[in-house]
UniProtKB/Swiss-Prot annotation:
<dbReference type="GO" id="GO:0005737">
    <property type="term" value="C:cytoplasm"/>
</dbReference>
<feature type="modified residue" description="S-nitrosocysteine">
    <location>
        <position position="47"/>
    </location>
</feature>
<dbReference type="InterPro" id="IPR034743">
    <property type="entry name" value="RH1"/>
</dbReference>
<dbReference type="GO" id="GO:0031267">
    <property type="term" value="F:small GTPase binding"/>
</dbReference>
<dbReference type="GO" id="GO:1903445">
    <property type="term" value="P:protein transport from ciliary membrane to plasma membrane"/>
</dbReference>
<dbReference type="Pfam" id="PF11461">
    <property type="entry name" value="RILP"/>
</dbReference>
<comment type="subunit">
    <text>Interacts (when S-nitrosylated) with GAPDH. Interacts with RAB8A; interaction is dependent on the phosphorylation of 'Thr-72' of RAB8A. Interacts with RAB10 and RAB12; the interaction is dependent on the phosphorylation of 'Thr-73' of RAB10, and 'Ser-105' of RAB12.</text>
</comment>
<feature type="modified residue" description="Phosphoserine">
    <location>
        <position position="7"/>
    </location>
</feature>
<keyword id="KW-0963">Cytoplasm</keyword>
<keyword id="KW-0597">Phosphoprotein</keyword>
<comment type="function">
    <text>Plays a role in the regulation of cell shape and polarity. Plays a role in cellular protein transport, including protein transport away from primary cilia. Neuroprotective protein, which acts by sequestring GAPDH in the cytosol and prevent the apoptotic function of GAPDH in the nucleus. Competes with SIAH1 for binding GAPDH. Does not regulate lysosomal morphology and distribution. Binds to RAB10 following LRRK2-mediated RAB10 phosphorylation which leads to inhibition of ciliogenesis.</text>
</comment>
<dbReference type="Pfam" id="PF09744">
    <property type="entry name" value="RH1"/>
</dbReference>
<dbReference type="GO" id="GO:0007263">
    <property type="term" value="P:nitric oxide mediated signal transduction"/>
</dbReference>
<dbReference type="GO" id="GO:0005829">
    <property type="term" value="C:cytosol"/>
</dbReference>
<keyword id="KW-0206">Cytoskeleton</keyword>
<keyword id="KW-0966">Cell projection</keyword>
<dbReference type="GO" id="GO:0016020">
    <property type="term" value="C:membrane"/>
</dbReference>
Amino acid sequence: MEEPLGSPPAALSALEKNVAELTVMDVYDIASLVGHEFERVIDQHGCEAIARLMPKVVRVLEILEVLVSRHHVAPELDELRLELDRLRVERMDRIEKERKHQKELELVEDVWRGEAQDLLSQIAQLQEENKQLMTNLNHKDVGFSEEELQKHEGMSERERQVMKRLKEVVDKQRDEIRAKDRELVLKNEDVEALQQQQTRLMKINHDLRHRVTVVEAQGKALIEQKVELEADLQTKEQEMGSLRAELGKLRERLQGEHSQNGEEEEAEIPPQPDGEESISDAEKAALDLKDPNRPRFTLQELRDVLHERNELKSKVFLLQEELAYYKSEEIEEENRIPQPPPITHPRTSPQPESGIKRLFSFFSRDKRRLANTQRPTHIHESFGQWAITHRDDGYTEQGQEALQHL
């Protein structure tokens, strides 16, 4: 069985690929191959043979396109969700550790306060005893013996040692409290740094989602543009084939008219070489339709306009996303709530017209044009007028298609 004319070899390689490796471009190649097969069946058996089958095939290809696009987007979204969950778990762990550390500091402070209170009470008691001893010493009139003096000096020395030991304990606890305060300050700085890092990672996550959305939109626009250009190219090739067929018919009719008229036409019509030159000029005028860079609206200009339109659309989309991002930042700064923003799931926008339907609509339009061009036409004007008229019609039709694309 012969391969259909103009079918891309990429469609055959797409059919041989693994299911997990399919992309949206492979789905479009498969759709193109199926469309060519439908076209050949229509040529052989008519449109009624596949009138009920074609909508079902189109629906199956659309479902395949959606599944393939979801398969390529889902892993990246899962990775981002896992990263966000991990950051949240880390933040909760840090908060829990900070609470435990705060409780430990409070316990240490309570113990220190209790010990300091005990020491202060002991100091007050010793001072009171010292005062009592001093008063007793002043009121006594009898002299102390040497043994009593040594005993009193021993008691005062012991009190000094107790006071010195108490002072050392207080200084040691004060140093420990200062060290704990410094450690608490360092922990707070670490917590603030981790919060800043979390905020930065959340911004990076938001930017990555934004870039993924922009790249998906640009990819879809490029795929649709490729499908439209391929369909336009096939349409132009079919139009050129029909024009060549009509040109051959006109040549045969002109030769028949020349042979029937005979000598009368030889007197009225210029010599044969000039006729051949006029026919060649008409052929050149008709064949000029093949030139992609012919005047008025060329295919290259159409591509430039479509490319510029897609760039402007992507720039507008980027500006809208940046404006929404800055507005959300201003709202967050006004509210000043230190909590991570909730996960925003993008709303499911209404499904645009699938590239599969657009591709099959081009095939049906090509069929209608071929059916219209194959009908017999009656020519009442000369060959030059016919060529000029069809050239203007071609320019008009090309301009209308360009306006539709724009």
